Amino acid sequence: MVFGFGKDDDKDKNDRRDNDSYGSSNRRNNDDSYGSSSFGSSNDDDNSYGSSNKRSNDSYGSSNTDSYGSSNRRDNDSYGSSNNDSYGSSKTDSYGSSNRSGNDSYGSSNNDSYGSSNRKGNDSYGSSNTDSYGSSNTDSYGSSNTDSYGSSNKRGNDSYGSSNDDSYGSSNDDSYGSSNRRGNDSYGSSNDDSYGSSNRRGNSDSYGSSDY
C-alpha cells in the first residue's frame, strides 16, 4: 500500500476582512485605525481620524460616517461632527439644553454625548453613533448636515453658532443651560448616559478605541 501525504501550507498569506492596522484599514465590518481609514476614506463601515464616508463604526476623533473637520456622512459622527447633535448645538438642542426626542448635547445625550453615549452601533471618544463633540448631522459646532469643522455642505442644517433647528447656546427648541426635554438629558447627565459613561446596547468604546 502506498500512502501519499500532500499539504500546501501558505504561511505568508493574510486575507482578512475584520482586522485593522495602526494607521490604515480597508475594512468592511470592523473599525478603523488611529490615523486613517480605507485610503483616508471609506464607503463601508470604517472610519479614520481625518476623513470618512462611513456607515457604521467609529474611531478616535471620527465616527461611523464622519471625520474630524469634514464628513459626507449618513449616520454616525466623528470628533467635531455628529449625525444628530453637537457641542453647543443640535437638531433640537443647544449647549447644555435640549428639547430632544432622541439625541442630546454636550455632556449628555439620549444617544450620545461628549465622553458618553447611549449608542447602538459603536462610538469613540468625543463622537458617537448619533452625536459627537462639536458638530452634528443636523448641527455642528460650526457645520452640520454632513458637516465639517467650520464649514458644511448642509441641506437643512446648521453652521457655526447657528443651526436649522438650533444654535450655539440656543436652539430652535432649547436654550443655553435649560431644556424642555422628554426622556433625554442636559449638561453632564443624560437620560441614558452621563459624562464619561454610557448606557449602550450594541458596542461601546473607550478613549481612542471602540468595541466593534
Curated annotation (Swiss-Prot):
Localisation per UniProt entry: Secreted, Cell wall
Region annotation (20 X 8 AA approximate tandem repeats of D-S-Y-G-S-S-N-[DT]) ranges: 20-212
Region (Disordered): 1-212
Induction comment from the UniProt entry of this chain: Expression is induced during filamentation, biofilm formation, after UV exposure, as well as by benomyl, caspofungin, and ketoconazole. Also enriched in azole-resistant strains and in stationary phase. Expression is repressed by SKO1, HOG1, RFX2, farnesol, and in alkaline conditions. Expression is also controlled by the filamentous growth regulators CPH1, CPH2, and EFG1.
Record's compositionally biased regions (Low complexity): 32-53, 78-119, 158-201
GO CC annotation, single: cell surface
Top-level taxon: Eukaryota
Sequence-type repeats, residues: 20-27, 32-39, 47-54, 58-65, 66-73, 77-84, 85-92, 93-100, 104-111, 112-119, 123-130, 131-138, 139-146, 147-154, 158-165, 166-173, 174-181, 185-192, 193-200, 205-212
GO process terms (BP): cellular response to oxidative stress; cellular response to starvation; cellular response to stress; filamentous growth; filamentous growth of a population of unicellular organisms in response to biotic stimulus; filamentous growth of a population of unicellular organisms in response to starvation
Keywords on record: Cell wall, Repeat, Secreted, Stress response
Knockout mutant characteristics: leads to reduced flocculation stimulated by 3-aminotriazole-induced amino acid starvation.
Chief location category: secreted
The family this protein is said to belong to: Belongs to the DDR48 family.
Function field: Cell surface protein involved in the ability to sense and respond to changes in the host environment. Required for stress response and confers partial antifungal drug resistance. Contributes to the DNA damage response. Required for the flocculation response stimulated by 3-aminotriazole-induced amino acid starvation.
UniProt protein name: Stress protein DDR48
Protein source organism: Candida albicans (strain SC5314 / ATCC MYA-2876)
